[in-house]
């Protein structure tokens, strides 16, 4: 209360939100200090007014929905390696070089453009298996379709939404609280699904994405 109208409160909040101390990261410390309704959980982030809240604070790049509990299935690296071997001829035909980090969505779209008709259905199935290994709780069909159709921006957004919804479906959390330290003043958003976020006129940041790779990081 008073953050937007009281310069002193805004300065105090901005200073506290940068502190990581006592086993709490940036944002967690500030919330714990400023509200009695915020408690640190034994495992996970915070309990706010009785709700389990996952806190994501971004002070450089965008927050990632990946941790020790939420990661691709163990068969994902093998599926990725098989894809690179199976479609080596088509990948080479695009003239693109696959870096050590893996294949980006726009590269997948380029490969789809040169895919022989007799391989189209199998290619789609293989991509679906790879995406499903990354997001085991989600229906990945629309993201795969967008990538195959060359709609790279749409595919990235769908991938980002899958990342959030997969994360929330696995974690024991009621919502995610995002704190963006890159804006002045800082901005906050709380949501329980990607639909909530988009419904509020916000969107997920979808930067460089490597669906076909061997390292989840």
Give, region by region, the residue ranges found by the protein language model.
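Nucleic-acid endonuclease domains
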Residues: 1-44, 51, 56-217
């Amino acid at each position: 209360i008073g953050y937007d109208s009281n310069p002193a409160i805004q300065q105090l909040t901005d200073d506290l939100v940068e502190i990581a101390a006592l086993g709490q990261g940036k944002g967690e410390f500030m919330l714990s200090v400023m509200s009695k309704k915020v408690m640190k959980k034994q495992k996970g982030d915070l309990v706010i007014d009785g709700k389990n809240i996952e806190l994501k604070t971004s002070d450089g790049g965008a927050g990632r929905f990946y941790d020790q509990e939420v990661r691709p299935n163990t068969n994902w690296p093998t599926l990725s390696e098989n894809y690179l071997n199976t479609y080596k001829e088509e990948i080479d035909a695009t003239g693109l070089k696959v870096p050590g980090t893996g294949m980006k969505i726009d590269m997948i779209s380029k490969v789809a453009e040169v895919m022989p008709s007799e391989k189209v259905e199998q290619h789609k199935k293989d991509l679906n298996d790879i995406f499903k290994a990354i997001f085991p709780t989600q229906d990945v069909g629309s993201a795969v379709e967008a990538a195959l159709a060359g709609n790279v921006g749409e595919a990235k957004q769908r991938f980002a939404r899958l990342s959030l919804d997969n994360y929330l479906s696995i974690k024991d959390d009621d919502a995610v609280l995002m704190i963006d330290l890159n804006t002045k003043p800082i901005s906050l958003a709380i949501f329980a699904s990607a639909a909530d976020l988009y419904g509020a006129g916000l969107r997920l940041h979808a930067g460089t994405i490597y669906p076909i790779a061997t390292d989840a990081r």
